[in-house]
Amino acid sequence: MQLSDRIIPTPQKLNVSEKTFALGSFGAVSYRIAQSKAHFSLEKATNRLKAELKERFGCEEKADASLVITLEGAEAPAGVKNPDQGYAIRAEEGKIVLSAFGEAGAYYAVTTLLQILKAEDGAFTLPAFDLLDYPDLQKRGHFVETRFGTDLMELEDWKQVVDAMVDVKENQLTVSVYGCWNMQYDKRISEYVFLPFKGYEDLKTPVYKKYYSPKKGDYVFDKVGTPMAEKDFFGELRAYGKERGVEVIPMFNSLGHNTLIPRLYPETSAKDENGNPANTGFCTAEPKTYEILFALYDQIIDRYSTPDNPIESFDIGMDEIRNEFAVDPADITHRHNAWCQCPICRNKSRQEIFFEHAAKLMKHLHSRGVKTVYMYNDMVVEHKTKLKPNPEDHSPLLKEALAKHGLLDVACVDWWAYNDVPEKLHFSDLHPELGFRSSIKPWNGYYHWSHVFHPIGNIYHMIKMAHASGAEAKRSYSSWDNSFHRPNQLQADWSWNWNGTGTMDDAKARYVRRHFPASIEAATKAFDLWDDITRQTNVQDPKNTLSNRREMIFSFLVYYRYSYYFDGRDYPRNYPGELVPKLRAEADFCAELREMQAQAEEAAKVFEEVAKANPDSAELAMRYRYEMMLYTAIFRDWTTLMDLDALAAKFSETKDEAIIAQMADLAKAQKNFRLEVIALLENTKEDYLIPSHARNQTIPMQYFADLEAYLKNTPAAELKLDLSDMRHMASETFMNLR
């Protein structure tokens, strides 16, 4: 592997000589570490270097070593961006010098050296080289949502997130600690609180585990608390991040995605036109709203801010403030308005309410020592929808409001969008001419509990916009699953070194060379298949599924989508029968399904071959194989249903009972395949991911188990075989899982 491919992210400047020098074999490297003076601390970097090299080389330092590794402070050369994070490395026979331009740069220099020092056949060899490196963007990291998976992460799991970010030189982890979504499972609103609050003990949310475990040989039905809230380890996580150069900051969604507080404290809720609590949003004319919000903010700052690690950044969210169904358990069919209609609020524009509210929150946080307050952009530059094809741009009003309250240096607008296609993004630049701070928020795929895809087009075009518009940060919208290793690493590359990382094809090829060097052609093929299965294209009709497969999968094929209430449809939804009329009517849709299934099956086989040929990355390749097995199972659900529907029609005509046996065998085969994939899940992924992933997989498995039992145990004359609605055969277990 060439030296540049070992370094993550892609370095800015690297000159490699043809000369090489040997360091020695494992257990026999003669080395010592020296430290020169610097105007900043080198302690963390030096301690890490000593500990890591002792393990890497398998031996202690020697006073008379033939290789001296020196860590020193230095002045950054002209033209270096973010110099406190920059560094240089010079390597030649007998010495390696790490010159850091700041404390963070020293830590990154060590990270790079450790990436370079890899043994081959038990021996360490290096070429002579000179490297100058620094990041294009000042802040680089992830916003990790309060959602499925994160609600079960222990402190050690969160530490692994920090470690993964350190490995790619990222320096900011935002943890969502309060957020709410619509009703989905268990006839409950999806609400999450990740911190305990004194005096507000009712602000806590349980986690329901409901799935079949092949490992246990039984169903799991349990209710537990969220570890971060129950064990109160957010402060420990912040300290762990601080020690490793990663700022860990809280996000508290403070207007949209907000149902728990207004439901429990109805005086704070947005009011409908009759003055009744809407159980969503806030009334910004109600003093109690700010009494509670400021009390919760203050507890976060007082408890988790320390003299050596103050909370200087805080995210208030403020996205997707809208009218929604299924945000009130008492009435899921009514559309509730998060914008207050009380006598005071109804006489203000939404922009006036929004900007006044944001300013109040920012001013309070700034008074508590917070220097940067992040806020989403979509209420500033509205997102394009079918109902609003030409949304309004309120960014000049934002500048006016920030300037009025002296917050231009405090507010940082977080620009987010999900589409891979640049023409379909909600904005084309970040309005640098207005002079407010901005960060970019691509996403990493997020929906790991349902299905994993890699939105590389979105990442590329969003970070391109960040560089063009002078954004200061990349703060990906994320959930954590190492199946997002590829998009996460490409984000790190493009936010560190835009020009050097190159095009999407360049970045994807480099990723394969880094991790699967023995199978470049095969790994490229597997990823190409994956990307084609989940492709997103620039089509006028987002439901043109033959072009836009990602929409096809998300809207029609995965169970997760059927967990939502949709206006005019039964709830719980008629799953999977709701899609059967489309399968009957659209031959092209069915043909596409079968092609996607064949592609997923092929990709799974290729990733298995890649794992065998690349032992250092075998675990990662097998994880990717699992994702392709899951896609195979998803597509097989529907191709099996198509075959069952054809047999049911044949039985209706012939009354041949042998057809029922065929149908039972098909249902059994798909049930067993689903069980195989759930077992693979349990052997592949971390414990905190299993319940949410397995639940979405157990539901289709249970459908086929119920169908098999129904076909085997019901007299043929009594069978009701309309696959568009088989709810009459649903077991209690099937309904409980939902």
Please give the residue ranges for each predicted region.
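A short, Lys/Arg-enriched amphipathic alpha-helix followed by its capping loop at the start of a domain
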Residues: 45, 49-52, 164, 168-170, ...
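A structural preference for short, hydrophobic beta-strand core positions in alpha/beta folds
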Residues: 61-63, 250, 375
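Contiguous, structured surface segment used for ligand recognition
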Residues: 1-140
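Structural motif
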Residues: 31-42, 70-75, 99-101, 145-146, ...
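Feature activates predominantly on carbohydrate-active enzymes
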Residues: 10, 82-347, 353, 440
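Substrate-binding groove of N-acetylhexosamine-processing glycoside hydrolases
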Residues: 3-17, 23, 43, 236, ...
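Conserved short-loop catalytic and cofactor-binding motifs
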Residues: 33, 37, 281, 349, ...
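Flexible loop/turn segments at secondary-structure boundaries
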Residues: 37-38, 150-152, 180-185, 255-261, ...
